[in-house]
Regions:
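N-terminal, active-site-proximal structural segment of metallo-dependent hydrolase catalytic domains
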Residues: 2-3, 9-76, 116
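Active-site metal-binding loops of divalent metal-dependent hydrolases
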Residues: 25-27, 58, 124, 185-186, ...
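Stable alpha-helical elements in mature extracytoplasmic
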Residues: 37-41, 49, 67-74, 88, ...
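Metal-dependent phosphoester-hydrolase catalytic domains
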Residues: 101-104, 108-111, 170-181, 187-296
């Protein structure tokens, strides 16, 4: 069953020889959150047949006096190159990394004899978390809110400075004419998802033009999943979360943004056929992985 879903989801990628597959994957406390071995996280990456992965929550965690740093072993098991961005962010690549920005936010990757792309990866700040604020779910010492204006204000307070730093680096490498990718757990939904149409359908409480995704859109970064699946009501593409609490607000927080190339497919890897295009069971993370396929 899993194999059949995999073949369907990957068919648009496999028949295009100039395709590069890019994924975003929050591995949940360096694989410790799901209480499964690191090899299960590697299986998720392997099942997607991806080429480049932005990893979030790869921090070294200590449990029972033992320090866990599983990302290097995952990269080695897959035969991938590894770039440590710091602060728990990693970029894994089937292709060699040949350069990086001074900030280490992004790397230049050689995907062919004369073909290069830039890959950025981020994990934007997690609190305050506006979907909880809007829905009366306690999370940190922050007030509940009711309006789009309040949601945008708190989102900017939490993430705007970091978004601006990434924008500057991305705009700089764009000048070279290369394809550019940005993966990440934004800890903030997309302005393409929380539309008035989605609010009218009861999917989200109100319309919100979320500022992080909007800011990247304004510099020419496109949302690959929403490009392939433009209907935010019929195909919400939830990546948060495979392990919902009773009060959970399901959402799409994990993104593969792109510029300078064409997206041909985008799919979700997760825990079940009901939620995902590619299934890995047991599933090791509290975020589903998103993978997109590109031609350049």
């Amino acid at each position: 069953c899993c194999v059949a879903i995999l073949c369907c989801a990957l068919s648009a990628c496999s028949d295009k020889p100039a395709t590069v597959k890019v994924s975003s994957f929050n591995i949940w406390l360096n694989t410790l959150g799901g209480k499964l071995p690191p090899s299960q996280t590697a299986k998720v990456i392997e099942a997607s047949q991806t080429d480049i992965v932005g990893i979030q929550e790869g921090h070294i965690y200590e449990e029972d006096g033992i320090k866990h740093d599983h990302v290097p072993e995952i990269a080695e098991s897959l035969g991938f190159h590894l770039f440590n961005q710091g602060e728990g962010h990693y970029i894994l690549s089937r292709y060699p990394v040949v350069d990086s920005t001074a900030s280490r936010y992004g790397v230049k990757i050689q995907v062919g004899k004369d073909k290069f792309c830039w890959m950025f990866n981020c994990h934007l700040y997690y609190i305050p978390y506006q979907p909880y604020q809007l829905n009366g779910i306690p999370y940190g010492d922050y007030p509940f809110i009711d309006t789009e204006e309040e949601a945008v204000w708190f989102a900017n307070e939490a993430r705007r400075e970091e978004v601006t730093r990434y924008q500057k680096d991305i705009q700089q490498v764009m000048k070279g004419g290369y394809p550019v990718f940005l993966t990440g757990d934004f800890n903030e939904p997309s302005f393409l998802d929380w539309t008035q149409r989605a609010a009218d359908a009861g999917i989200h409480k109100i319309k919100v033009e979320w500022p992080a995704t909007k800011a990247f859109s304004e510099i020419g970064m496109n949302d690959s999943y929403r490009t392939i699946h433009p209907d935010e009501v019929s195909t919400p593409g939830y990546t948060w979360t495979p392990v919902p609490s009773e009060q959970e607000i399901l959402d799409r927080l994990d993104f593969v943004l792109y510029s300078g190339c064409k997206v041909t497919d985008s799919f979700i890897t997760g825990e079940s056929e009901a939620t995902s295009d590619v299934v890995v069971s047991p599933y090791p993370s509290d975020h589903r992985m998103v993978t997109s396929c590109f031609n350049f």
